[in-house]
Amino acid sequence: MSLRSHEAAACAVIAIGVCGVLVGSLLVESMRNGQSSAKATVSTAQSTEEIQAQTEPTQMPAPTPEPEPVVQTVHFSATGDNLIHEGIYNQARARGSDGHYDFIPAYENLRDFYAGFDVNWLNQETLVNDDYEPSGYPMFSTPGDITNALYNVGFRVFSLSNNHSYDKGAGGIASSMAHWAAMPDDVVSMGFYNLETYDDYVYQTVNGVTIGYLSYTEMTNGLPTPSGSEYGVVYLDQRDVIEKQITDMRPNCDVLVVSCHWGVEGSHTVTDAQRETAQWLADQGADLILSLIHI
């Protein structure tokens, strides 16, 4: 209804503008006809006035001023990697009770820091679920209680695409996705995509700004996409898929955030391949590229 009202107003402005031009033309024609019929009796001074009336330009309506741009600001933080080794979940188990894990003390000192941002984004490096026993290096699985602590400290956006996404096979993917789907409505997660359509698009609106999120990885520790899984990651070399996803999402968001889990393990040096890929992503339409080094 609101859109239709705006459309009607826009049409009215256009109609008034057109009528103004047409009415002006008709008035000029009326003056010409009247002066022509009295031509034999008018004075020279009147003839001069007639000429001025005929040559005076038609007054056009003033153009509608352009609206002033509205500046909307979103304060954004990005953190990673949240990699939960055995020692961390064992400490949480010792603090917890009734079979639960208490991860809150591990993050509590960061609460004030993250409170200063409108959006807190996190690369969750390990699978999170309660269907698998917790495990650390090299094949990780993290108790679901960790999301209570992460939510408590202020994280609302979670990337799940990284080199440990396939650590527990198809079952791990399904369990982790189910866990994140059960989070509160203000939580968004991305990184596992339907392997047929790849159209699992995620948006978030903050302070009037719509943000779109995509997450990719360079590797999955040598593990192939699990057999029988409907969902999986998108690798950074799948450019046809990435190009389509960006093309689909770009018209629907003000800012498009793309995260990349990549690099040489143990190195902070940016490679030429990373630079080339980042430029390509920007050329496709990415506004912000989050680079997660593989260390």
Task: Give a label for each model feature.
Residues K39-T41:
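Juxtamembrane extracytosolic/periplasmic "stalk" immediately C-terminal to the first targeting helix
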Residues A10-G34, Q46-L292:
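Acidic, metal/ion-coordinating pockets
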Residues M1-A10:
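Short, low-complexity patches enriched in S/T/P/G
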